[in-house]
Amino acid sequence: MSHDSDARHGARLAAVQALYQMELAGGGAEEVAEEFIAHRFGETPTDEDFFKSILEGVPARQSEIDKAIAACLTESWTLARVDSILRAILRAAALELVARRDVPARVVIDEYVGIAHEFFAGDEPGFVNAALDRMARRKRAKEFGLPTPDDELDF
């Protein structure tokens, strides 16, 4: 990995942890971002601006992001049933898929499946891969050589 990709990976991992903290303990994006930057950054390279864009973007677009995630889950799963760290992973990835067209969909999927592997040893990374692949094919159909579905225009 290059320094830039390491820094982006660090930002994604920190954003997932911060989103998890926000969901469990409360607190706004700005407050949590300040805490992470002051106390948790430094050990690994982290792109602070990228981190903040994810951390601020998810709450700002949460209802539409959650709708996009729910549409990619199987009928037997609801977003509320998904483990809270998996929810944070899916939300951060969904934000990138809908708001960061400069990042290829396959990179987003690979990065967040990798992050899922950092937290889980079981089937969860496969779950993340399947959900994000479905979402990417709907939201970024052109990148996969697919016809553009109507819901790609939802965001």
Model-derived segments and spans:
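N-terminal interaction/assembly modules
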Residues: M1-F155
